[in-house]
Regions:
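Alpha-helical bundle segments that constitute or directly flank the non-heme di-iron/ferroxidase center
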Residues: 21, 27, 92-124, 187-218, ...
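Intrinsically disordered, low-complexity terminal tails and linkers in eukaryotic proteins, enriched
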Residues: 357-358, 362-430, 447-521
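Cys/His-rich microdomains that often coordinate metals
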Residues: 408, 438, 442
């Protein structure tokens, strides 16, 4: 009689090979270079795709089982947060403006990353890289969805949450993070992996998620904290994918080293410029602060990133360019950014305010060499104007950097009293950039950056009005027309003091008896 012999259970490596077998076939109807044309045009030389392996070896059956368990826990907490009026447990309604910025500026980028990884997963010939990109693509769309679901409860009670998908395409300050991803998505697959998988996910992700998630926890926002921690296990895989791809390219051919080095220089600088918004949030938008932007940069980039680049030195990779500029900027950029948003609060979908005396003392302690000298006098002057009923709004439009698209507000590395301007000439036209880093990036690829969609230029050209708008009619208000195009509603913009958000918060917390609409008016 035949005996049933129990089959040996496959190990993780064997199971991964079994589940992904057949994905790396050699084409016969068309040559491989026609099926994967993007794999060679950047100049990266790959001799053996089998040398790259996914260290997590995650298969689809394991992925869905693992993620479904996380989703159950996440949505249970989100439901409990909503049912128990969790929005009233945050430290102060000013904090809500930080997550308005997150929803409009970061969550759409998660969806853009989903699209990007789905695309490059098709463009890589190597099966291991394709499967890893597929998993990350799924992660990114899940992150976008869970962030929107977690923050949707706030949309019932606060202004400015209603239309992030239109805002990311139209609003002036959101062109900063959007241009970063537009730049990455219009690059080849290897540069995309370097920009998102390495520079952003590996080098800079802690500076994005740790301040937001820790800040949320410290300010009583359990919904934001929960989706942040839920995403952290995914981020570990994303960081590994980025680092493994970098090492894979460097190990395949020495000719890849200068190409990868240029990408690391470019995308570290571009990512750092995007994180200006995070620095502003850390220093000014959290009523209860976790750490300063300067401290976060020193811990998560200078120390952790320094160790990473020491490891990559054996491949011939040096630390990114312009670190001396960044070392100077870390004492300034958050203050310069907040001063800019304070002036343009009438054109922003979140509220701004001036730091009080206690908060300015905290900033003075964290930035002892710069805040009292350069920024406290400015804020004090604006407070005196506001006390007289002359709250300052800047009604002009600023020059924008052609690369990072941030207004030209940053100062020279050796002179904090002088605005940094750089110029480049291309085909008879002048283009302006905000720093040596952005100028070098422009000069390397001018044909790409001359096509940048700059919001200020578009406003002056009349492209930021709704169809049918006639700018020639008597009494035409261009700002009102632009805000209508942005789809801003009453109460989305202007100063926090006197806003419907402040009035409602005071009423809900029993701190004021006035009618919110009357008080806001």
């Amino acid at each position: 009689m035949d005996m049933n012999v129990k089959k040996k259970k496959l190990g993780l490596k064997e199971k991964y090979a079994h589940m992904t077998r057949g994905l790396d076939w050699q084409t016969s109807y068309q040559p491989m270079e026609k099926v994967f044309p993007q794999a060679t045009f950047e100049g990266i030389k790959i001799h053996d795709w089998d040398k790259w392996e996914d260290p997590f070896r995650l298969t689809m059956d394991a992925y869905w089982k693992y993620q479904s368990e996380k989703e159950k826990k996440l949505y249970a907490i989100i439901d409990a947060f909503a049912q128990n009026n969790g929005h009233l447990n945050v430290s102060d309604a000013r904090y809500i403006n930080a997550i308005k910025l997150f929803l409009c500026g970061i969550s759409p980028l998660e969806y853009a990353a989903h699209r990007g990884f789905a695309r490059v997963g098709r463009e890589f010939p190597g099966v291991g890289t394709r499967v890893a990109c597929l998993m990350q693509s799924l992660d990114e769309i899940r992150h976008a969805q869970t962030q929107i679901h977690s923050l949707s409860n706030y949309n019932k009670f606060y202004n400015g949450f209603h239309n992030p998908t239109d805002m990311i395409q139209r609003v002036w300050y959101l062109s900063v993070p959007r241009s970063f991803f537009d730049d990455a998505l219009s690059a080849g697959p290897f540069e995309f992996i370097t920009s998102i998988g390495f520079s952003f996910e590996y080098v800079l992700t802690n500076l994005l998620f740790v301040p937001f998630v820790s800040g949320a926890a410290y300010n009583g926002d359990m919904g934001t904290m929960t989706f942040g921690f839920s995403a952290q296990s995914d981020e570990a895989r994303h960081m590994t994918l980025g680092l493994e791809c970098i090492k894979f390219m460097l190990e395949q051919d020495p000719a890849n080293v200068p190409i990868v080095q240029r990408w690391i220089d470019k995308w570290t600088w571009r990512g750092y410029r995007v994180l200006t918004l995070v620095g502003m949030m850390m220093d000014y938008m959290l009523p209860k602060r976790v750490m300063s932007w300067k401290e976060a940069w020193e811990v998560y980039f200078e120390q952790n990133g320094g160790a990473l680049f020491n490891d990559l030195a054996r491949y011939g990779i040096r630390p990114p360019k312009w670190l001396d500029q960044i070392s100077f900027d870390k004492d300034h950029i958050s203050h310069q950014a907040w001063a800019t948003f304070y002036q343009y609060a009438h054109a922003s979908a979140f509220h701004t305010w001036l730091p009080n005396d206690e908060e300015m003392d905290w900033l003075s302690a964290k930035y002892p060499t710069t805040f009292d000298k350069y920024y406290r006098p400015r804020f004090t002057h604006w407070r005196e104007m506001a006390d007289k009923g002359e709250r300052f709004y800047n009604n002009t439009l600023p020059m924008l950097c052609q690369v990072c698209q941030i207004p030209m507000v940053f100062t020279e590395p050796d002179d904090p009293s002088k605005i940094c301007y750089r110029e480049s000439d291309y085909e008879g036209e002048k283009y302006h950039t905000c720093s040596d880093g952005c100028k070098q990036i422009f000069d390397d690829e001018p044909e790409k950056y001359v096509q940048a969609w700059l919001p200020v230029h578009q406003i002056y050209q009349g492209n930021c009005f709704k169809p049918g708008t006639d700018p020639t009619v008597p009494g035409f208000d261009p700002l009102a027309a632009v805000l209508e195009y942005y789809n801003f509603g009453p109460g989305d913009n202007m100063d926090y003091v006197g806003s419907p958000d402040e009035a409602n918060w005071l009423k809900w917390k029993g701190l004021a008896k006035e009618d919110p609409a009357k008080k806001a008016a």
